[in-house]
């Protein structure tokens, strides 16, 4: 049986270069299909997250600490879609890197930085939602614009510092010089990382993920208790006070927001867990994972950057309304920034 993944004749990324990497060609039909699938993910990540950023920045009604966190998260996913996914697509399908060693390091650095930035944003968003649900009336005084700004700064600075250390200082290759030398060929962009730094990378994924799981477990427990309390209060007295009515509306709104962002967090964990586990296994068991499994795990993770706008569009009526206004060009009209996006 003829395989799509190999041919009898050996092919090189650069035919006239002795140190060229070996090319593993796909059949023309499969290549077209993969370009369509991967390209669609990149376009969706770019366009979808750009709509989120424009919505939050343009409409004044969306100018809140929590929404600025969401816009910053969308910016990270947008950068994954525009600066990482297109080049990874070519590398995955052509099995060669045609963009040079310098850009290989930059691409790898951006890849790690933007993806960890997404994780850090989600962790801070879970903290925001926890405060909003457990203390809805004092939440505006606790999670202010300045606090949101600090969270956003940390979510960008730490991943950039970590990624720069891994890909530009050479410390991540200590002890695996022979492997680095073996992987060094023209047309390749495979960055080898030693076990210590792989473990650090795993902890950078595991610790924020654990924090999010704990916080969202508490959020849904508190939300359930609030729902029961509000229902009991309403059924016990026909004349509900304005304060109790306000509490009920606030609690309901924050529970819905927590549910939506809980789905976002779950989607991130499901998308990134296979890749993280695969990387950990490879580092400690001698790179036993087949290349195609690694590629599949990597692209499942990449596709997460395209999922968040779809989640917002499904759960948030205000986002659907904002999309209509943006795509119709109505945001170019005067005073469009003051348009009401909420039904209530």
UniProtKB/Swiss-Prot annotation:
SMART domains: 7TM_GPCR_Srsx (SM01381). It is a multi-pass membrane protein. Residues 55-67, 128-146, 218-256, 320-344 are cytoplasmic. SUPFAM superfamilies: Family A G protein-coupled receptor-like. The chain crosses the membrane at residues 34-54, 68-88, 103-127, 147-167, 197-217, 257-277, 296-319. The keyword Amino-acid biosynthesis does not apply. One of its GO terms (biological process) is G protein-coupled receptor signaling pathway. One of its GO terms (cellular component) is plasma membrane. It comes from the Eukaryota. Its main location: membrane. Glycans are attached at residues 4, 18. The keyword Repeat does not apply. Disulfide bonds join 21-185, 104-189. InterPro entries: GPCR_Rhodpsn, GPCR_Rhodpsn_7TM, TAAR, TAAR_fam. It is found in: Cell membrane. Belongs to the G-protein coupled receptor 1 family. Olfactory receptor activated by trace amines. Trace amine compounds are enriched in animal body fluids and act on trace amine-associated receptors (TAARs) to elicit both intraspecific and interspecific innate behaviors. Ligand-binding causes a conformation change that triggers signaling via G(s)-class of G alpha proteins (GNAL or GNAS). This is Trace amine-associated receptor 8b. It comes from Rattus norvegicus (Rat).
């Amino acid at each position: 049986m003829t395989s799509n993944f190999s041919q009898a004749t050996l092919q090189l990324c650069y035919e006239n270069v002795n140190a060229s990497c070996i090319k593993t060609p796909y059949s023309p039909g499969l290549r077209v299909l993969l370009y369509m699938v991967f390209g669609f993910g990149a376009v969706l990540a770019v366009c979808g997250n750009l709509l989120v950023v424009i919505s939050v920045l343009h409409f004044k009604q969306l100018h809140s600490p929590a929404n600025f966190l969401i816009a910053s998260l969308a910016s990270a996913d947008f950068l994954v879609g525009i600066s990482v996914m297109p080049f990874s697509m070519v590398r995955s399908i052509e099995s060669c890197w045609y963009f040079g060693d310098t850009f290989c390091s930059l691409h790898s650095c951006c890849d790690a930085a933007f993806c960890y930035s997404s994780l850090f944003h989600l962790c801070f968003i879970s903290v925001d939602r926890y405060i909003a649900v457990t203390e809805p009336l004092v939440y505006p005084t606790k999670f202010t614009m300045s606090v949101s700004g600090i969270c956003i700064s940390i979510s960008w600075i730490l991943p950039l510092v970590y990624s720069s250390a891994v890909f530009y200082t050479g410390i991540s290759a200590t002890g695996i010089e022979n492997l680095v030398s073996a992987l060094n060929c023209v047309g390749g962009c495979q960055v080898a990382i030693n076990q210590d730094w792989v473990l650090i990378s795993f902890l950078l994924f595991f610790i924020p993920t654990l924090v999010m799981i704990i916080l969202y477990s508490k959020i849904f427990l508190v939300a359930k208790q609030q729902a029961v309390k509000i229902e009991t209060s309403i059924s016990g007295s026909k004349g509900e006070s304005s304060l109790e009515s306000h509490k009920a509306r606030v609690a309901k709104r924050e529970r819905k927001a927590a549910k939506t962002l809980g789905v976002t967090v779950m989607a991130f964990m499901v998308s990134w867990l296979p890749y993280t586990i695969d990387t950990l296994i490879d580092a400690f068991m001698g790179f036993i994972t087949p290349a195609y499994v690694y590629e599949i795990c990597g692209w499942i993770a990449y596709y997460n950057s395209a999922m968040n706008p779809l989640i917002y569009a499904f759960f948030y009526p205000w986002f659907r309304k904002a999309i209509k206004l943006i795509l119709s060009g109505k945001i170019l009209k005067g005073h469009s920034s003051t348009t009401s996006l909420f039904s209530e």
